[in-house]
């Protein structure tokens, strides 16, 4: 998942995308990975929440998303960009960890890839206000 070739392919696949489209693509890829590797991903996310470390998976995800959030909203100051990136990562983790409750509450099955994609796009619009 984290191989150099894989990230090079992502760069090539997203070449010409807008910053929002890149963020959407990366988010969908992240969510798909979490759901497709449920057990290990759940342990990883919960470990990051329980014992945060400077370079844990949540931090690395935040670092990867930060420049894309900034590119989507160049009008915002750095503090606002950092907050919005934090909101996005937190919501994505909750979408994953609490998918059953969220699915019941909102009436959408987040185990279904298309439903996840649509919900993720809505979350991006809500958080980024674009």
Locate the predicted segments by residue.
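C-terminal peripheral helix-coil segments that are non-catalytic and often amphipathic
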Residues: 66-78, 91-130
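Amphipathic alpha-helical packing segments from all-alpha helical-bundle domains
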Residues: 21, 25, 43-74, 82, ...
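Hydrophobic, amphipathic alpha-helical faces that serve as interaction scaffolds
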Residues: 40, 84-87, 93-97
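Hydrophobic alpha-helical connector segments
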Residues: 2-36, 85-88
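Amphipathic, well-ordered alpha-helical segments in soluble domains
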Residues: 3, 36-40, 61-68, 98
């Amino acid at each position: 998942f984290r191989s150099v070739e894989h990230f090079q392919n992502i760069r090539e696949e997203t070449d010409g995308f807008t910053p929002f489209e890149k963020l959407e693509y990366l988010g969908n890829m992240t969510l798909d990975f979490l759901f497709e590797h449920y057990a290990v991903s759940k342990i990883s996310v919960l470990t990051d929440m329980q014992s945060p470390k400077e370079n844990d998976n949540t931090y690395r995800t935040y670092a990867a998303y930060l420049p894309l959030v900034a590119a989507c909203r160049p009008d915002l100051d750095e503090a606002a960009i950092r907050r919005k990136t934090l909101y996005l990562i937190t919501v994505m983790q909750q979408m994953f960890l609490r998918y059953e409750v969220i699915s019941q509450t909102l009436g959408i099955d987040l185990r279904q890839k298309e439903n996840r994609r649509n919900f993720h796009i809505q979350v991006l619009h809500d958080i980024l206000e674009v």
